[in-house]
């Protein structure tokens, strides 16, 4: 019989020692070493207890709580779906209750145009807050007052001043004028002189346009509607452009001023055209 190697000897010794400990020898050996043979303390060796298999539950792959990042992405999508559903329900004629937290599309566009309000309640972009929509009946009434003012202005200027004055300078010796005593007075003589026509016509136009402008302001005050800000389509179109897109400061205000000057200038051009036509007719008739 061959001799055992050192490794085999150590293995057999370890197996015998393990078998001895498993039969209860570990506790008695521990008591001898520590001197607690007659002690009431628990001196049972852990080696004497049967080894219980410890099972650990597998770690869950996914956490029970939802991901915060995922919730932040889902919330706007849900709001957008609610808004689209509400708009679709309105388009098909069905009354769909809309969540109070869902923003209105028109209000969102309006807030983008005017800017978010600051602490003082004014828009951050420097634009005025959007006014309430004007009733169509009020617009019709304003147009009626404006057209009536223009009609009366043209009638008074043409019939009661321009037409008689043009007839006077083209026919100063007509048999119509001696019938009126005021035509023979000294202050009436400059009116009969054709060389004073340009100065007299310019003075009359300045006075008539000034009076018309004041009456126009009275119409706006009476109807509570501004003639250009609330009725002109070009001004409304420019007001939709956000501040800073076009490199012109106060573009809406400058456009309104330009349109006001054009309105007054168009009246002057109309009167000049009327004068030229009447002078041509009176000259060749």
Swiss-Prot record:
Region of interest: Disordered: 1-72, 87-106
GO CC term, one of those recorded: GET complex
Transmembrane segments: 149-169, 197-216, 264-284
Main subcellular location: endoplasmic reticulum
Cytoplasmic side, ranges: 2-148, 217-263
GO molecular function, one term: protein-membrane adaptor activity
Protein name: Golgi to ER traffic protein 2
Single GO BP term: retrograde vesicle-mediated transport, Golgi to endoplasmic reticulum
UniProt feature, compositional bias: Polar residues: 24-42, 93-104
Organism encoding this protein: Saccharomyces cerevisiae (strain ATCC 204508 / S288c) (Baker's yeast)
Modified residues annotated as Phosphoserine in this record: 45
Family from the record: Belongs to the GET2 family.
Alphabetical list of Pfam families matching this protein: GET2
């Amino acid at each position: 019989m061959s001799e055992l190697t050192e490794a085999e000897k150590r293995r057999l010794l370890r197996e015998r020692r393990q078998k001895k400990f498993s039969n209860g020898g570990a506790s008695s050996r521990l008591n001898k070493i520590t001197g607690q043979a007659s002690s009431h303390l628990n001196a049972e060796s852990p080696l004497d207890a049967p080894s219980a298999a410890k099972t650990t539950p597998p770690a869950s792959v996914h956490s029970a709580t939802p991901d915060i990042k995922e919730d932040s992405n889902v919330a706007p999508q849900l709001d957008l779906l609610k808004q689209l559903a509400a708009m679709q329900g309105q388009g098909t004629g069905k009354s769909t209750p809309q969540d109070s937290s869902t923003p209105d599309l028109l209000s969102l566009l309006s807030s983008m145009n005017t800017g978010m309000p600051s602490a003082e309640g004014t828009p951050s972009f420097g634009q005025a807050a959007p006014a309430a929509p004007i009733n169509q009946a009020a617009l019709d009434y304003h147009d009626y007052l404006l057209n009536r003012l223009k009609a009366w202005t043209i009638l008074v200027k043409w019939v009661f001043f321009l037409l008689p004055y043009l007839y006077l300078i083209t026919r100063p010796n007509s048999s119509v004028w001696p019938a009126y005593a005021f035509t023979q007075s000294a202050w009436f003589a400059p009116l009969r002189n054709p060389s004073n026509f340009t100065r007299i016509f310019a003075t009359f136009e300045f006075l008539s346009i000034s009076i018309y402008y004041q009456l126009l302001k009275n119409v706006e005050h009476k109807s509570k509607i501004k003639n250009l800000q609330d009725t002109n389509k070009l001004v409304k179109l420019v007001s939709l452009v956000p501040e800073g897109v076009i490199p012109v400061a106060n573009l809406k205000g400058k456009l309104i001023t330009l349109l006001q000057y054009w309105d007054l200038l168009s009246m002057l051009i109309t009167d000049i055209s009327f004068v030229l036509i009447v002078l041509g007719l009176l000259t060749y008739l």
